[in-house]
Structures are given as structure tokens and as C-alpha cells.
From Swiss-Prot:
The gene is ispE. It catalyses: 4-CDP-2-C-methyl-D-erythritol + ATP = 4-CDP-2-C-methyl-D-erythritol 2-phosphate + ADP + H(+). This is 4-diphosphocytidyl-2-C-methyl-D-erythritol kinase. The active site is at K14, D134. The keyword Plastid does not apply. It holds the Pfam family GHMP_kinases_N. The keyword Coiled coil does not apply. One of its GO terms (molecular function) is 4-(cytidine 5'-diphospho)-2-C-methyl-D-erythritol kinase activity. ATP binds at P94, M95, E96, A97, G98, L99, G100, G101, G102, S103, A104. Catalyzes the phosphorylation of the position 2 hydroxy group of 4-diphosphocytidyl-2C-methyl-D-erythritol. Pathway: Isoprenoid biosynthesis; isopentenyl diphosphate biosynthesis via DXP pathway; isopentenyl diphosphate from 1-deoxy-D-xylulose 5-phosphate: step 3/6.
Length: 275
């Protein structure tokens, strides 16, 4: 949609159809094994040229916003352009919910800068992992198996015909806090690999989808966040499957027939362009 000559980029939320932690690395990061899926809930970034630098306006608090980190790292690597940008960020993705909103926004700005200055995706991916562990996925988007700390991404053919409902909690969970509560004895406990779960979705096998849905962080929230576990149980009564996404606090339910959101095949994309 054209907004006063701006370029509008959509940044889509993600859910983790499965999420396991393999190990904690010596550098403090955790290695994951997960099936990521973008959904049709999105933030909107309206971007216009200005004389210099990066300005951000938003409907939420923007202090230390990840978009500043994107700009700083981009300018550090490629030198600051002769002109800058104003970003009007319309936040619709709940924060601290495990839906990847901040990472999606970062990828959206990186995507825009890459297109504007003709930088190949391979270079953008190298920059993305320095911004945040989930950012590379959003540059690729859709359906993918994600490993390592988020930098190992295997895109898979898009899953279609699935719908999603979300329930959020009043109290968000910071990723750092959630990982700090993980006990190594919980690592590598997923009942299926992400590939087995993907095939179950591909074949629309409801029983196998339910069996293979897994999120290691449910072991953490079970003892500390009763409201979240209640939300999972609520969605499991009405959907094929339901689980926590990311490290929480949002939970999702998947359906064949209807839902507020649907699976999408992009992490970021232009809504309409006019620069």
C-alpha cells in the first residue's frame, strides 16, 4: 500500500512447529533443532528517504530498537550512505512472545537496504546473524529447518492449507530468561526430527502432527507460568495440535479449516514500492 511515497515492507511473524535444544556451546549460545514457519501476522515498516541517518517512529517504545543495530552494522560494513531513512514501524506482533517480531523487523530493514543498494542475499545473511539468531531465517522465510544458533537454514517447499490461532499472555518471557532456566538434562528430547514433522504436515497426517509437535520450553513454563500451560491445553481441545512458540509466551494452535492466521511462504516482502 502506498503511504505518502514510502516503501512499505511487511515483516511476518514465525511459529516453531517444533523446537528442541541440542546443546549449550562454549560461547554461551545454545544450538537448536527446529521447524520454523512464517504466519500471516505481520509488522509494517513504512520507509522514506531523509537527508541523513536513521530515524524511527513507532506505536510502541523504540528505545534500543533492533533497527538501530541493523543500521549501525550496515553502515560499519558498507559505509554510511549519502542519504538516510525514516522508518515508521507499525507493531502488530506481540513482543517477548516467541513470535520473532524484533528479528522480523530487523530482517525487513535489512531486506530493504539490500534491495536499495543491490547487496546479494549471501552477504546480508552474514550480517543478519550478527544482529540476532533468528534474523537469517526471516530473510529466507516460509518453511525451514533451522539448526545451530540460527545460522543453518534449510528451506523446504511451502506448506499450504493450514490455519493458526494464537493466545498470548499478559506477561512476556525474555529469551535470555527462558534459556537460563533450561536444564541440560532436557536437551535432545524431541519425539521426532523436524523432517518427520514436516512430512506429517505435507501429508496432512493429523495424528503424526500431534505426536511430533514439541517445544522444550514447555518444560520450563510448566512450573513457572501456569497461564501459558492453560492456554496450550485450551487450544489443544479445538485444534489439530498446539504448543508454545519459541521461548514463549505466545502459544499457537493449528487447524486444517479455519483460523485467524495462515501459513505464508515469505519472511519479509514489499507491500508496495515507491521511492
Amino acid at each position: 500500500m502506498e503511504q505518502n511515497g514510502s516503501t512499505v515492507v511487511r515483516a511476518y511473524a514465525k511459529i516453531n512447529l517444533s523446537l528442541d535444544v541440542v546443546k549449550k556451546r562454549d560461547d554461551g549460545y545454545h544450538e537448536i533443532n527446529s521447524l520454523f514457519q512464517n504466519i500471516s501476522l505481520y509488522d509494517r515498516l513504512s520507509i522514506v528517504k531523509i537527508d541523513r541517518g536513521l530515524e524511527i517512529k513507532s506505536n510502541v517504545e523504540i528505545e534500543n530498537n533492533i533497527l538501530y543495530k541493523v543500521w549501525d552494522l550496515f553502515c560499519e560494513k558498507y559505509k554510511e550512505p549519502e542519504f538516510g531513512f525514516r522508518v515508521i514501524l507499525e507493531k502488530n506482533i506481540p513482543m517477548e512472545a516467541g513470535l520473532g517480531g524484533g528479528s522480523a523487523d530487523a530482517a525487513a530493514l535489512l531486506f530493504f537496504l539490500g534491495k536499495t543498494f543491490k547487496i546479494p542475499t549471501s552477504e546480508l545473511l552474514n550480517l543478519a546473524i550478527k544482529i540476532g539468531s533468528d534474523v537469517p531465517f526471516f530473510l529466507i522465510g516460509g518453511t525451514a529447518v533451522v539448526k545451530g544458533k540460527g545460522e543453518k537454514i534449510e528451506p523446504l517447499p511451502a506448506l499450504k492449507g493450514y490455519y493458526v490461532d494464537l493466545l498470548t499472555s499478559e506477561n512476556g518471557i525474555s529469551t535470555k530468561e527462558a534459556y537460563s532456566l533450561l536444564n541440560p538434562s532436557l536437551f535432545n528430547r524431541a519425539p521426532c526430527s523436524p523432517y518427520v514433522l514436516y512430512e506429517a504436515y505435507k501429508n496432512r497426517n493429523a495424528g503424526e502432527i500431534k505426536r511430533c509437535t514439541y517445544n522444550i520450553f514447555e518444560k520450563v513454563v510448566a512450573n513457572n507460568y501456569k497461564e501459558i500451560m492453560a492456554n496450550i491445553k485450551r487450544l489443544r481441545r479445538t485444534h489439530i495440535t498446539a504448543a508454545l512458540t519459541g521461548s514463549g509466551s505466545a502459544v499457537f494452535g493449528v487447524s486444517f479449516r479455519d483460523g485467524k492466521y495462515k501459513f505464508v511462504s515469505r519472511g519479509v516482502e514489499y507491500e508496495e514500492t515507491k521511492l
